[in-house]
Amino acid sequence: MPVNEEDLKTYRRDLHKIPELALAEFKTHRYLLEKIQSWQTNFMTIRQVEELPTAMLVKFSGTDPSRTVGYRADIDALPVTEDTGLPFESTHKGVMHACGHDVHMSLALGLVQYFSEHQPKDNLIVFFQPAEESKSGGKLAVDLGIFEGEWHPDEFYGIHDQPNLPAGTLSTLAGTLFAGTAELEIDIHGQGGHAAYPHLGKDPIVISAELIMLLQTVVSRDVDPIEGGVVSLGMISGGFTNNVIPDTVHLAGTVRSMTKDGLDKMTTRIRQIVEGVALANDVKINVRLETGSYLPVENNPDLANNLLSFMEQRQDIAFEEAKPAMTGEDFGYILQHIPGVMLWLGVNDNHSLHSAKLNIDEAALLPGFNALKDFIEWRMSQGE
């Protein structure tokens, strides 16, 4: 039986009901495993990973393989309380598939279902990856050696849903699609006291204001305007009443760049600014910058151009060339080790990714699946 829209909608809705946070996707894993086991064939191997227990890989041995093609779908959700009113909304309080990973999984299940009935020409590995949102599951998988030996894809593909695109429209580019990110935390240790006697202490609130303004010069004065970048502080915490200077202020934010070199330059400059402000104010400032897991998603130019060629040939597939986005995705870490391409899939919603009201248009599922399946078969028909 061919994979149809109702199949994909069922998978998506079932998974939407049971969202789970990074590395705790046990119900999700069980659901995926039960579905996949129901399609078991003699040319399919299901692999579970002891060190990463919610991960799963499904390998189809090809009829005449000259390569191994990989497809990755992330499976975790976000700590968001859903506010959609859908009949299949989250049954897990405070957790929601607000980034569309239910969509990603439904497409991957569709691939497994289809290729269990149509043995591919080349080897195919479908990777269900935990912990994209916060625990760097892509890095964990690579560092554990999951993709070594017979489980090594020669090329990797992935899809991410995009509310700003029409339902079913695919989009990518030959180059960097998503930014690399670094998470920033700063703790300013001043000396608190009575607000009427600021000269007797060291006011971390005033120092934080100075630091916040200086950090905004990193992009405007240290980054090539053609390359771009982002330094955004989304959290400031300090003090507990109006007439007491606190001892500490905590800042947190994100740093983003379209290149690894750009990200390295920005984080170095941030550290220099923090050190300078600490010295100028005679206080201690601790800075933490987490980098290395959410690298830029750099599409391999040859593979991306090959995919673009396929899209040009298929007038029945809605496609538009993408612009680079400041979105972060740990698929970038995988692509540092295995060449590949990530695409957007339009899901047509007025609410953004990570919104409690995100409600994707399920009309995107079948065209997204068909385009993905057809591309994989076309790619395999090309030979080496």
Curated annotation (Swiss-Prot):
Give the metabolic or biological pathway. Answer: Amino-acid biosynthesis; L-lysine biosynthesis via DAP pathway; LL-2,6-diaminopimelate from (S)-tetrahydrodipicolinate (acetylase route): step 3/3
Gene Ontology biological process terms from the UniProt entry: diaminopimelate biosynthetic process; lysine biosynthetic process via diaminopimelate
PANTHER family associated with the record:
N-ACETYLDIAMINOPIMELATE DEACETYLASE, PEPTIDASE M20 FAMILY MEMBER
Q: Does the keyword Repressor apply?
A: no
What would be one Pfam family of this protein? Peptidase_M20
The entry's function note states: Catalyzes the conversion of N-acetyl-diaminopimelate to diaminopimelate and acetate.
Keyword Hydrolase applies: yes
Reaction(s) catalysed (UniProt annotation): N-acetyl-(2S,6S)-2,6-diaminopimelate + H2O = (2S,6S)-2,6-diaminopimelate + acetate
InterPro entries assigned:
AcetylDAP_deacetylase, Amidohydrolase, Bact_exopeptidase_dim_dom, Peptidase_M20, Peptidase_M20_dimer
Protein keywords: Amino-acid biosynthesis, Diaminopimelate biosynthesis, Hydrolase, Lysine biosynthesis
Q: What is this protein called?
A: N-acetyldiaminopimelate deacetylase
| EC number(s) given by UniProt | 3.5.1.47
One GO MF annotation is: N-acetyldiaminopimelate deacetylase activity
Family, according to the entry, reads as follows: Belongs to the peptidase M20A family. N-acetyldiaminopimelate deacetylase subfamily.
UniProt superkingdom: Bacteria
Q: What is the active site of this protein?
A: 74, 133 (proton acceptor)
